[in-house]
């Protein structure tokens, strides 16, 4: 029997070995192939010595799954989940278990990527289209986005849209009603300052007294009052004011739509539709506008088009509005949105149907009526005389009420002016109303819920005025009226899932996206009620588990990045960029250098960089790259010197977007610092840094971290994400704060960038688990394996395709770029053809035409085994052989497996296929691996031009689905 130590038998590194794809023997085989003795040797060949860390991370040792779960369970138990009546945009909800199990906890839904390859994403595209239909029906407007990050961010986007489209071109004032949620006003003010807009806050009716380009109103407002704005909106629109409305999605089920009142833009949080509060997120925001504003909409929009067979097919529409194409001229910097949560909300609407939603909304309103009637019967005065779910009470002994509430384990809303608010929700029961009477009135009140209900039924309720009762039908499309049984709902979800390719089927090698394993053990805590059901504005002493988790995660990220502090608030990488640039902006202002507003950005940068710089009020100056893809130092020096007086910063990605460690990165930092600028190092490629180098060690001042890339939060088909920023000490006082929650930091009073103080805190346990389980050694080994996998793929493919950029010792970092331009010139086969042909082989295409047009960028990550890498390599080699047949004239350039890809079942069943110069087997079973595990695209190649020229972004007739 082999003698093993107890430490070996305890297998503390078991999670590490399961997270990393290649086992030790495969790693050695791959190392031998690429010409390295060990992972450390390979690292030394790739990473410049000048930036290589000489010491290990100080995260701690790796641990087993059971140990990690036990530790985080202890943190969860420190959270006190009181019954929340705080409201303010966050409400208790009942997540239907059929959605919880089959969507939220299903890797077929949460590991997919943004549907840039729509032919293999028709399932979630349909679910998102349903979300858009829900949004349009409830708001009464024409065109909805596929989701934004949160309600407050959506408000800022609405303000920006208003300025873009308003005919009041000379106006520079945006009016905000003084009864909006405070966190919404906070985020709007932050964005307005960057744009140079003036924000005027006042009673809603005073909006007409100002020269405005736009105005924002809350429906219902923070106190619960619901108002008919029809006349006010008409008066404002007559003055060319763009009217925007923050609306409650559940209230809209019963209320007259803002669109019917004359609103131009309506937005809000879809959290109430079956998504837990999660201490602030993640939640999908809906955003809907009039059709005339469609070209100015922010974010993704799903539209209906057709494929090459003329069949209905869905795709992302009007992408020319977005950051990856328009860069600093984009409508928004939005990249990652909240697709997983939007899908949950859409399925919630599908499962309940219109009648089920009306029942839920009516129950919430009835309980609110009962609560109000009982309190008023006892002489309690209310601030509001109309309501959907919220009443605000004045004249109470606030201290006594608060003491009784805490003793009863409930949280109410306590405003600074002595008003006490109570917001009810889907989870409210009769017993909760009894408990609220006890807390607000004290014992012995004698009120009876059943008697009060009978009184309301007999007398009728006036809480929703007749003029504000919705008269039009909602959700009439058959999709919302046929899946109310759980069996049918389960099958509908499965039917959509089967149309999509996600990580649970095959590798997704998207460069710059880091589609690594999202381990099941990392995902488990997210569903626990101790994490899922916390209100973000609850007293912090009730959230000790969350607080400790955030502090531990922040300290680990500080160690990994080499920075001094971390701000968790940003909800995505793009929002992290915006937050980091704001910190730089405020830093310069604090030094009397507000004129520093120029941001240098290499021409190879991701589109979010210039878009974020524009949002932060900066002017973009592009610097050149040399033929090797590196920053042209001479051009950088010249431009830095030229704009030195006004230089704010540089935004640079490391390793570069070309997939190499630039040797001159420290010199780049020094050049910018010498001219008074700051260095923003984009953390998109952090998966090639962890444990080997760090932004702080390199010389940067601030970075965002994509927790949904490097730190294992799943991409969710296009969100959620997290983009916390790490900063050097001198920038720490200038990171985002929050108007509601102030934990006692120097940055507390700064403006917010997100609605919640800790952003999408509900998914932070995923990254916490990832780091805790891997430990210092595991994090470093993961990075090294990512380098190994990328260089193995690069060397294998270099025998068949030109590799565009390489660094020292002919190596790449964690990703490589293959150049398809010579192939296109010789054969007519395009990068699009190759991307779609990969679908036939069961793969999602790598990143296409970024950072160089006519290329594919491949990032395999550390989680893919040698077996899967070889399967992908074999597919690419086989495709190269197919291209050779086109080059040789064996297959026509306009009729071959690449040009016609992807192939569907309908293709091979069609007798017309016999006229093609290749067989059905070549079309759909091009490799042995595919024969035993076939993924079938459900549509042929989609016509993008047709989709944009014939824009249609709502649910189509059911016959088109069947």
Swiss-Prot record:
Disulfide bonds: none annotated. The modification N6-(pyridoxal phosphate)lysine is found at residue 709. The glycine cleavage system catalyzes the degradation of glycine. The P protein binds the alpha-amino group of glycine through its pyridoxal phosphate cofactor; CO(2) is released and the remaining methylamine moiety is then transferred to the lipoamide cofactor of the H protein. Belongs to the GcvP family. The glycine cleavage system is composed of four proteins: P, T, L and H. It comes from Shewanella sp. (strain MR-4). Its cofactor is pyridoxal 5'-phosphate. It holds the Pfam family GcvP2_C. Its EC number is 1.4.4.2. It catalyses: N(6)-[(R)-lipoyl]-L-lysyl-[glycine-cleavage complex H protein] + glycine + H(+) = N(6)-[(R)-S(8)-aminomethyldihydrolipoyl]-L-lysyl-[glycine-cleavage complex H protein] + CO2. It comes from the Bacteria. One of its GO terms (cellular component) is glycine cleavage complex. GO terms for biological process: glycine decarboxylation via glycine cleavage system. Signal peptide: none annotated. Keywords: Oxidoreductase, Pyridoxal phosphate. This is Glycine dehydrogenase (decarboxylating). InterPro entries: GcvP, GDC-P_C, GDC-P_N, GDC_P, PyrdxlP-dep_Trfase, PyrdxlP-dep_Trfase_major, PyrdxlP-dep_Trfase_small. SUPFAM superfamilies: PLP-dependent transferases. One of its GO terms (molecular function) is glycine dehydrogenase (decarboxylating) activity.
